[in-house]
Amino acid sequence: MLWFKNLMVYRLSREVALNADEMEKQLSAFAFTPCGSQDMAKTGWVSPMGSHSESLTHAVNGQIVICARKEEKILPSPVIKQELQAKIERLEGEQHRKLKKTEKDALKDEVLHSLLPRAFSRFNQTFMWIDTVNDLIMVDAASAKRAEDTLALLRKSLGSLPVVPLTMESPIELTLTEWVRSGELPAGFIIQDEAELKAILEDGGVIRCKKQNLISDEIAVHIEAGKLVTKLAVDWQERIQLVLADDGSLKRLKFADTLREQNDDIDRDDFAQRFDADFILMTSELAALIKNTIEALGGEAQR
């Protein structure tokens, strides 16, 4: 089981019936296939259980996990530039004239087509967890763009997907700043030693603190000067450490060893049973964390 490292959280904006059996059929039409000789990139669905299953969905207790794979061909710019320049120089020498921009653009396309079959590929996978009980979708991505790209593939597969980023009633950066200023956090949360502070004005600078006592005069001076806490490392229930960000994302999730070891009594050779047990454990913990985080940040914005 791949334990999620980041959470970009989205709210289903209207009631949608998502079930694994129906999704299985819909996702299969967009299953991953490798790049052909002239493809720059390909994206599609693969089994969240890897080679242990052919199913594109895995569901337990109303929780569904799916996985998108992306293949990208790597063509370094210097290689393209070198090949293109050689072609341009050869043709200009043969024709005794300077090539027009449109001709150079056409040559660049030719160069790309000739290089693609020999290009190396880069692969990445993005897991998505759909909580049908709480109408939430979580993407294991550190950036909004990667999360949105994966949601776009799911939207294309399902035909529609009415989701919006999870937002709070109060600006998150104001809440985080007050936590650091006062040194008081809601029950269950303990401040750690890492944060990012930004000035309200765009050109006012950014301060990134690591291994720093955040409840200190030094940090208080920055807050008094108008800087806001935009990222804050916290510990939740001594079970999960994470960084809360002002965009509502939960980054760099680190599960306590005592938590991850709870299913060690299950034979690791029984992959399906261990995957099930770890998925149930992870999603139940993260669902509780998300619920507590929403409450701690002042509640979700009313739609």
UniProtKB/Swiss-Prot annotation:
NCBIfam families the UniProt entry points to: PRK00321.1-1, PRK00321.1-3, PRK00321.1-5
Similarity comment: family membership: Belongs to the RdgC family.
Keyword presence, Phosphoprotein: no
Keywords associated with the record: Cytoplasm, DNA recombination
MF term (GO), any: double-stranded DNA binding
Organism: Serratia proteamaculans (strain 568)
Cellular compartment(s): Cytoplasm, Nucleoid
Cited function: May be involved in recombination.
Protein's recorded name: Recombination-associated protein RdgC
An individual GO BP term: DNA recombination
